[in-house]
Amino acid sequence: ILKFALSEKNIVTATKYLKVLPVIKKLIVYLNIPAPSEERGAALWHKDDFGYKSLDLFLAVSDININSGPLYYLKAKKELGVFLKIKNIIKNALPGERNKVTLESFSNYFDKDKIGALIGKSGTGVFIDSFTTYHRGGYCKSENRIMLRISYQTPDTKRGQQPYNQQEFAYYPKIKKKDIKNIFHRYILFKDRNKFLQFIKIDKIILSFIKIFHYKL
């Protein structure tokens, strides 16, 4: 998985989109199982509020159909990007539902033909910007879903800034910084903000700026 995440094609794709050499802030394989309840949490419409720009690869490990919790995403490109927000979010939200939008509310803003779905055989994938694109997924009706997610981001984002051993790769501690000889791979896996940017809490400054200029539908 790590070799695939560091593949030249993926890194070049992320670099072209982000305009800088990316860092990997999320590398995870999801296993979702059928749920008796209605959609909640990440199965509701949302954006990931961690920064200004991201490029996330979602890749089907198992075959995915309508019954196994496909990823849904807004295909329509919005010029306002991260600044666009739907104001009709869930009130008195339960844990995991903060800033989420119900399926019913979302349908009042965007037609079905504006929504894409990651459905297909194992190996089918899609790149989306999870910071600027509304998306949801993981609600399995009757079948399991296994999906790989890789988030390529810039070092100034909030995601991945929690304390951890910086000499080990957070998602697979057997990967040691000292063992990575390729300087680009070392940057991608272990790069953190410099101490000055950490001191001024640049991620909070960026997020506050974005919230000030939100355009709410």
Predicted feature locations:
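N-terminal auxiliary "cap/dimerization" subdomain that precedes the catalytic jelly-roll/cupin core
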Residues: 1-23, 117-121, 195-217
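Conserved double-stranded beta-helix
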Residues: 9-80
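Short catalytic/ligand-binding loop motif for oxyanion handling, primarily in non-cytosolic enzymes
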Residues: 37, 66-67, 81-82, 135-137, ...
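Short histidine-centered beta-strand/loop micro-motifs
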Residues: 41-48, 118-119, 136-140
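Short, surface-exposed loop/helix-turn segments at secondary-structure junctions
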Residues: 41-45, 100-111, 163-167
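Conserved hydrophobic/aromatic beta-strand scaffold that supports enzyme active sites
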Residues: 44, 56-60, 115-117, 125-127, ...
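Double-stranded beta-helix
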Residues: 67-133
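Non-heme Fe(II)/2-oxoglutarate
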Residues: 87-88, 125, 131-217
